[in-house]
């Protein structure tokens, strides 16, 4: 059974955006490892960050409410708005979420690095109110501009696009791709960086079309003043030695001689699964002529149990020279027009 993000934050399913922010603020301060020394604090801190990232994003929250954690992370929520598959993967760094929530600063040092007035320890603060006002932070955790009423807003960096080349055989059968990316991650202080490698796993579904987009939200470089970019992979077909692709159909070009084009022939048509299908051609092969073998193409993306067709085009090879006697025979037997 998947994680209950609402339970992790201690809120009801119908909680407002402000309730979610308030709950994250409370839980993050409670379980921050620099404050909470229990063995479970680090894992709880990470769970709280993941829950906040999902529930504070309208699209992720909608998918989670419908399909749960497995649907959110497995791509059950449909497209990303650009024709690609939306799937969520937590970036794994709760300290980056903590720093981003507070606008790239580290209020943790302010709260827990000194005692409050009157000898009251900061760990005892009531964090359901507005504990940030005295330190220049607004209720949602962003730095407060003293000359403005509302909080500043972080902008997300543009998506980082990569091409992902796949063979027709991989599209035919489906496959798993593991893509290694390198990115910058913020340290806990919210200012310095470290380099990090991560493996992103992509499940290539049967029949996916060229141009399909797979989006990993917020997996790009972290900076103090912006939201990490989405990493986007776009499916591109590899060139194939035998076939061309036409949607869910595939095209095979059969090379035959002029004699075979006029008198008929038998050919073996290869398939994507490694078989050969014998085909007799008894008609005269004319320019643009095609034959069709139904159901031997690629799976349909939305119904992979059904497949497109295998189309056979013909390329007629003409002789470079022909004898005078052969020309005479052709003149006698071939129509003039």
Swiss-Prot record:
Disease entry from the Swiss-Prot or TrEMBL record: Congenital myopathy 21 with early respiratory failure: An autosomal recessive muscle disorder characterized by diaphragmatic weakness, respiratory impairment, and spinal rigidity. Disease onset ranges from early childhood to adulthood and severity is variable. Death from respiratory failure may occur in severe cases. Some affected individuals may show developmental delay and hypertrophic cardiomyopathy.
Keyword Iron set for record: no
Function: Probable chaperone. Stimulates ATP hydrolysis and the folding of unfolded proteins mediated by HSPA1A/B (in vitro).
Name of the protein: DnaJ homolog subfamily B member 4
CDD domains the record matches: DnaJ, DnaJ_C
Gene induction: By heat shock.
Phosphoserine sites (modified residues): 122, 148
One Gene Ontology term of the molecular function aspect: ATPase activator activity
Transmembrane segments: none
């Amino acid at each position: 059974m998947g994680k209950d993000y609402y339970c992790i934050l201690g809120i009801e399913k119908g909680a407002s955006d402000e309730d979610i922010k308030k709950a994250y603020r409370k839980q993050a301060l409670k379980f921050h490892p620099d404050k909470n020394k229990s063995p479970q604090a680090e894992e709880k801190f990470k769970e709280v960050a993941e829950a906040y990232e999902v529930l504070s994003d309208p699209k992720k929250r909608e998918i989670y409410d419908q399909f749960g954690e497995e649907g959110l992370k497995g791509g059950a929520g449909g497209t990303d708005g650009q024709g690609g598959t939306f799937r969520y993967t937590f970036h794994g760094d709760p300290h980056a979420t903590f720093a981003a929530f507070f606008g790239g600063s580290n209020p943790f040092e302010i709260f827990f690095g000194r005692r409050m007035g009157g000898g009251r320890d900061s760990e005892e603060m009531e964090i359901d109110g507005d504990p940030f006002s005295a330190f220049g932070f607004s209720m949602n955790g962003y730095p407060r501009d003293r000359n403005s009423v509302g909080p500043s807003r972080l902008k997300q960096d543009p998506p980082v696009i990569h091409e992902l080349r796949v063979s027709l055989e991989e599209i035919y059968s489906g496959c798993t791709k593991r893509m290694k990316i390198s990115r910058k991650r913020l340290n806990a202080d919210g200012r310095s960086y470290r380099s990090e490698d991560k493996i992103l796993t992509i499940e290539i579904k049967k029949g996916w079309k060229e141009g399909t987009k797979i989006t990993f939200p917020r997996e790009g470089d972290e900076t103090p003043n912006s939201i990490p970019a989405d990493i986007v992979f776009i499916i591109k077909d590899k060139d194939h030695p035998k076939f061309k692709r036409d949607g869910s159909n595939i095209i095979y070009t059969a090379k035959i001689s002029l004699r075979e084009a006029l008198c008929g022939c038998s050919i073996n048509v290869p398939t994507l699964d490694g078989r050969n299908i014998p085909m007799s051609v008894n008609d005269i092969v004319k320019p643009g002529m095609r034959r069709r073998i139904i159901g031997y193409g690629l799976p349909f993306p939305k119904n992979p149990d059904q497949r497109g067709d295998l189309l056979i085009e013909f390329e007629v090879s003409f002789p470079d020279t022909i004898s005078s006697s052969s020309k005479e025979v052709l003149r006698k037997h071939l129509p003039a027009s």
